[in-house]
Amino acid sequence: MKKADRYLYPAVFTYVPGQEIAVVFPDLDAATCGADERDALFSARELLGCVMFGLEEDHAPIPAPTPLHDLVLAENERAVLVDVYMPSIRTAQSSRSVNR
């Protein structure tokens, strides 16, 4: 099966005053955080790339992303679509494996 070049998944950003922004991928059972929105988005992309690479390497099923309109959010939460370009992730991971 051909691997996808790009994945796009919803992430839920949770805002609590005085705390980092929590980021959860409901479809992937994965979470991260960031000091601000920019940092949270970068962390989310990095996490998404790692999770998807792991699923591909394990030949695990890739879950379908939940449509944004199906997410149930609290007042302090926002849904954000996060994308990752996998060819660069795969290259970086294979280079990392060779260098070890």
Positions of PLM-derived features:
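Residues that cap or initiate secondary-structure elements
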Residues: 17, 29, 88-90
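Short acidic, gly/pro-rich beta-turn/loop elements at beta-sheet edges
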Residues: 21, 33, 92-94
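Short, charged, surface-exposed hinge/linker loops at domain edges
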Residues: 1-8, 45-100
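Conserved anionic group-binding/transfer micro-motifs
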Residues: 40, 44
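A short, exposed loop/beta-hairpin motif centered on an aromatic-Gly-Thr core
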Residues: 28-39
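N-terminal segment of the canonical double-stranded RNA-binding domain
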Residues: 1-19, 31
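Short, proline-centered helix/strand-breaking motifs
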Residues: 24-26
